[in-house]
């Protein structure tokens, strides 16, 4: 798609990471991607897609051809020995989502690729090699079992404020020779930290894996652990709740219960002598729930008792005495399909120290000067048994205390119980994040600004758009928008990071995803979310208002589920990725047909809409044209307008796949609904002239009760007659 290639070029403004080409060409190939990721490990397809961008200090540079080489080793690729695939020189300006078409890539395969392009200004050199590996493609490629504990333990509870201690699981393994390559595949529900010989894997990654409906999809992560293995090895994992063991369980009809934390791990080891083996989870692994993390709850926070650290000292290293630990239970196999995580997921980034500390009675109020989503780390000093509490908030009351009404019943508090030996040790939670600018700290004496550090925790993605104006207020609005969007990327787009909700509402992103895409490279997040929405669809075609369906809100709405076709369209036009359209089209078709069959009246109008013009902003007097004092837009008008747009998108999606008959059927249905919409909602007052040069009387043509919403939808969705 030429428009997407042009966008790729325009968005690439930095040459700092460029790969050098011939001096005469003045062209650089940058941002090489496999499945839109940099050197990804364990991708979930045997036909990956390659992308790159070009930059130049000249104008009018256009790619005219490319050649891709893929090899099974770096050495072969350096010799231009493409034993997996040589695309040959292809006359094309395409730079996005070029599909691999070489030899079959099997589970665990490792490959290297590079590209050379020709432009109207000359030919480039070969780029530097890029790496990708294939994950475990299917259940039959996995060994071992799911392990964990399948019940509550002493001190744990369901109900309004669920409590569950972290699960600590480990096993030692002896290598049977010199290791050539070792790869770990880790599925840990709900969230986990994974260790090999004492080394925490994943770097800055946090709260892995990204959340899904575990009844449908379970993501695993892949780690290359070759350099960490020795003769004796320890494989260990710490499991938190995430969304697996939900934060609230007092309403069974509303919140699905997925089960208790569990894991499945495969470490595939390849030796220099050609032999292989798999270290896999089973009931010979050992488990403890008596570690320091006594409770972890996304709404309520994390409780950490450092007095329990000593008993687990060295638990992630080989040779640890786990004889007093219990055997891990073999758990029921989750219903969800194991799949490679298609995105990096959340990462922790250091924000900085507070801008102010203020004492209020026995409480210290810290202000970081910026609302964000993440957690606070601090330097621990105290006597054994001292309790440090960190209570989070987004704003303060007039008296300087925390304002907490907007948190509702989310406790949002991290608790640390000292062992008396910390002496300034740094601590921060592992399995709970918060929305905050402020925090109230109790239990710390002689605290300083440098004792506290805020960290953001959100999905890893680049900022690709920046706007700065001469207006300071507008600049502040834009800055706040950046922080608001970024703080709500949590492996899925959520509505808020602070209160007892944090749900992936579809309606928020029906239009929001498009606006966000001008600021963030959010393709991986939203492609993953399309899969979530399809997972959440019921057999009758109903798509819920929240997906993954962590709340059972199947209201049969139109405007909220419209996020599926709307966002698929965004991914195609903004990032050139048509795969979400292809994958989601059956669900879109099923949903549209369901709504049309169940909620179309005899006049051709959609009768069902739950939310209407949700949270409509106040209007200035000069913008009010409606004579209706309530100015509430008819839900039928909104639902029908959105369905008309969805039918238009369905037609486009069908044409994109060559489904001409389906495309025509969608177009016919859309045209009929447009006629019905205009008959039902369009007012054309007598005396109105449609002749050129004649005056059009104010408010003589309008939709519904003449609200801004009613008129704008008709214009935006191409419903208003010419």
Label for each model-derived stretch:
Residues 71-72, 133-139, 204, 640-657, ...:
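Conserved, charged catalytic cores of large soluble enzymes
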Residues 552-573:
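Thiamine diphosphate
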Residues 567-570, 646-649, 653, 717:
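Core register positions within helices of long alpha-helical scaffolds
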Residues 568, 640, 647, 710-711:
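TPR repeat positional signature
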């Amino acid at each position: 798609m030429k428009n997407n290639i042009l966008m790729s070029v325009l968005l690439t403004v930095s040459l700092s990471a460029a790969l050098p080409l011939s001096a005469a060409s003045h062209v650089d190939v940058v941002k090489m991607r496999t499945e839109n990721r940099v050197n990804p490990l364990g991708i979930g397809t045997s036909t990956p897609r390659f992308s790159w961008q070009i930059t130049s200090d000249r104008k009018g540079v256009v790619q005219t051809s490319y050649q891709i080489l893929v090899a099974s080793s770096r050495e072969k690729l350096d010799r231009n020995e493409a034993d997996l695939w040589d695309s040959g020189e292809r006359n094309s300006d395409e730079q996005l989502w070029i599909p691999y078409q070489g030899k079959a890539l099997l589970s665990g395969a490792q490959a290297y690729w590079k590209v050379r392009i020709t432009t109207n200004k000359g030919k480039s050199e070969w780029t530097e090699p890029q790496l990708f590996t294939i994950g475990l493609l299917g259940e039959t490629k996995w060994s071992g079992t799911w392990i964990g504990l399948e019940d509550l333990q002493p001190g744990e509870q369901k109900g309004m404020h669920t409590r569950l201690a972290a699960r600590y699981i480990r096993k030692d393994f002896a290598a049977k020779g010199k290791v050539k390559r070792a790869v770990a595949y880790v599925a840990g529900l709900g969230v986990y930290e994974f260790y090999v010989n004492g080394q925490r894997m994943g770097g800055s990654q946090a709260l892995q894996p990204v959340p899904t409906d575990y009844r449908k999809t379970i993501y695993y992560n892949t780690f290359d652990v070759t350099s960490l293995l020795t003769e004796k090895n320890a494989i260990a994992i710490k499991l938190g709740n995430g969304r697996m063991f939900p934060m609230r369980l007092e309403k069974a009809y509303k919140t699905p219960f997925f089960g208790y934390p569990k894991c499945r791990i495969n470490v595939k080891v390849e030796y220099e002598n050609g032999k292989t083996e798999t270290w896999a989870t089973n009931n010979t692994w050992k488990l403890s729930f008596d570690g320091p993390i006594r409770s972890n709850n996304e709404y309520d926070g994390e409780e950490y008792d450092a007095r329990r650290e000593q008993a687990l000292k060295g638990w992630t290293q080989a040779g640890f005495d786990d004889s007093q630990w219990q055997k891990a239970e073999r758990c029921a196999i989750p219903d969800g399909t194991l799949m490679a995580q298609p995105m990096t997921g959340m990462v922790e980034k250091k924000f900085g120290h507070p801008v102010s500390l203020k004492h209020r009675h026995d409480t210290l109020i810290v202000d970081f000067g910026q609302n964000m989503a993440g957690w606070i780390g601090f330097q621990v000093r105290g006597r054994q048994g001292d309790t440090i509490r960190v209570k989070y908030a987004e704003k303060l009351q007039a008296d300087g205390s925390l304002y907490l009404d907007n948190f509702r019943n989310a406790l949002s508090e991290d608790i640390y119980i000292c062992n008396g030996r910390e002496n300034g040790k740094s601590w921060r939670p592992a399995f709970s994040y918060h929305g905050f600018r402020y925090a109230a700290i109790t239990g710390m004496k002689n605290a300083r600004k440098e004792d506290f550090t805020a960290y953001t925790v959100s999905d890893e993605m680049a900022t690709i758009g920046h706007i700065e104006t001469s207006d300071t207020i507008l600049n502040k609005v834009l800055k706040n928008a950046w922080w608001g969007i970024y703080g709500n990327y949590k492996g899925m787009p959520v509505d808020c990071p602070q209160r007892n909700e944090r749900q992936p509402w579809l309606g928020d992103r029906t239009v929001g995803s498009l606006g966000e895409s001008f600021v963030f490279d959010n393709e991986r997040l939203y492609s993953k979310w399309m899969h979530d929405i399809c997972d959440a669809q019921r057999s009758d075609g109903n798509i819920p208002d929240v997906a993954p369906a962590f709340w059972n809100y199947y209201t049969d709405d139109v405007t909220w589920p419209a996020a599926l076709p709307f966002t698929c369209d965004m991914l195609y036009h903004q990032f050139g990725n048509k795969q979400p359209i292809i994958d989601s089209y059956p669900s879109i078709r099923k949903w549209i047909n369901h709504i049309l069959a169940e909620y179309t009246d005899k006049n051709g109008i959609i009768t069902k809409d739950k939310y209407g013009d949700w949270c409509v902003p106040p209007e200035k007097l000069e913008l009010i044209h409606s004579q209706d004092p309530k100015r509430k837009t008819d839900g039928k008008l909104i639902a029908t307008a959105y369905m008309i747009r969805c039918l238009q998108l369905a037609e486009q999606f069908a044409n994109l796949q060559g489904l001409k008959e389906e495309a025509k059927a969608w177009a016919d249905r859309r045209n009929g609904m447009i006629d019905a919409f205009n008959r039902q909602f369009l007012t054309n007052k007598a005396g109105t002239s449609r002749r050129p040069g004649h005056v059009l009387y104010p408010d003589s043509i309008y939709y519904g009760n003449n609200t801004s919403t009613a008129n704008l939808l008709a214009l935006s969705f191409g419903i208003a007659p010419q």
